[in-house]
Amino acid sequence: TEPVGTMIVDIGGGTTEVAILSLGNIVFAHSVRVGGDKIDEAIIAYMRRTHNLLIGEASAERIKKNIGVARKPEKSTGIKIEVRGRDLVNGVPKEITITEAQVAEAISDPVRQIVDGVKMALEQAPPELAADIVEKGIVMTGGGALLRDIDGVLRDATGLPLSLIHISEPTRHDR
């Protein structure tokens, strides 16, 4: 059997795992300490830094899931969402509106780190497996892979096709 290379990118909560597999074995694996949690933290830090607004993890995750996007929309600021938190200047509750473009700016660093991890793994791929990856592309999975346009960002950065495999979390009924 001839070795066939496959690249898997699993963007989880705490880390992004990048692996190159062949014949059921891991040929190369790399872990980037960036995942959905770091994206949430970046949103929290952005809100604090640019709006003097303290928000919690649940609010950051809601922002990420509702209007999170891996890069700025081309033609406008995109969809808007209301965000509530505590004003860090006077300590009272405050509501502001933020846009997709602002969220993309907020999460640009963790997105870049994920892209860099994928590119580094591609550079380490054995040549014969790299040819397979060029042909088959990259398979993405994990909750972070659901971030809107992360596939487009990775496609543009690598020149490779991407496919998404979403494995839903088990429900109480499934257990």
Located regions from the model:
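Conserved phosphate-binding catalytic cores of ATP/NTP-utilizing and phosphoryl-transfer enzymes
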Residues: T1-V9
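Structured core elements
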Residues: M7-I8, T15-I20, L54, K80-E82, ...
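Phosphate/pyrophosphate-binding loops at sites that engage ATP/ADP/AMP, CoA/4′-phosphopantetheine
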Residues: N52, K119-K136
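Phosphate-binding glycine-rich/basic clefts of nucleotide- and phosphate-handling proteins
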Residues: L23-S108, R112, I133
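A short acidic Gly-Thr/Ser loop motif
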Residues: I8-T15, L21-N25, G35-D37, I43, ...
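Single conserved hydrophobic/aromatic residue that forms the stacking wall/gate
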Residues: I165-R175
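Glycine-rich phosphate-binding loops at beta-strand->alpha-helix junctions
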Residues: A130-L154
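Catalytic phosphate/nucleotide-handling subdomain of diverse soluble enzymes
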Residues: I150-L164
